[in-house]
Amino acid sequence: MPKTVVIPPGTGKPLAPYVPGTLADGVLYVSGTLPLDAEANVVHEGDAGAQTRHVLETIKGVVEAAGGSMDDVTFNHIFLKDWADYGAINAVYATYFPGEKPARYCIQCGLVKPTALVEIASVAHIGKPA
């Protein structure tokens, strides 16, 4: 099955051998997204809400570059560093999915960047029914 690599304009260099998104048969897989600037520095250190907003804006950019919208997101994998940030993450998350919510799971774990508080990976169905 052919696949299309999705790299939005202005995307920084990844931390490992991956791309921001891959589109195959109308399904977009968005890589785990950390709150990083173009030089791979963590932004908004200590602020889980602001980091979540940055991550979701980055994901939104990948989805839009593939021709979709956040309404096309059907599943999110959320990784958080500390359960104490769960409420702040959810408050911001809810603003990006005001209607029907995508399925998701959330786990607490260590993240590749020590000052990152959240990482999200997504799946979206673009151009075809989910």
Swiss-Prot record:
GO cellular component: cytosol
Major enzyme class: hydrolase
Pfam families for the chain: Ribonuc_L-PSP (PF01042)
Catalytic activity annotation: (Z)-3-aminoacrylate + H2O + H(+) = 3-oxopropanoate + NH4(+)
Keyword annotations: Hydrolase
Coiled-coil boundaries: none
SUPFAM superfamilies, A to Z: YjgF-like
GO MF entries: deaminase activity
Family stated for the protein in its record: Belongs to the RutC family.
NCBIfam families to which the protein is assigned, alphabetical: RutC
Function per UniProt: Involved in pyrimidine catabolism. Catalyzes the deamination of 3-aminoacrylate to malonic semialdehyde, a reaction that can also occur spontaneously. RutC may facilitate the reaction and modulate the metabolic fitness, rather than catalyzing essential functions.
PANTHER family: 2-IMINOBUTANOATE/2-IMINOPROPANOATE DEAMINASE RIDA, PROTEIN HMF1-RELATED
Annotated protein name in UniProt: 3-aminoacrylate deaminase RutC
Organism of provenance: Methylorubrum extorquens (strain PA1)
Designated gene of the protein: rutC
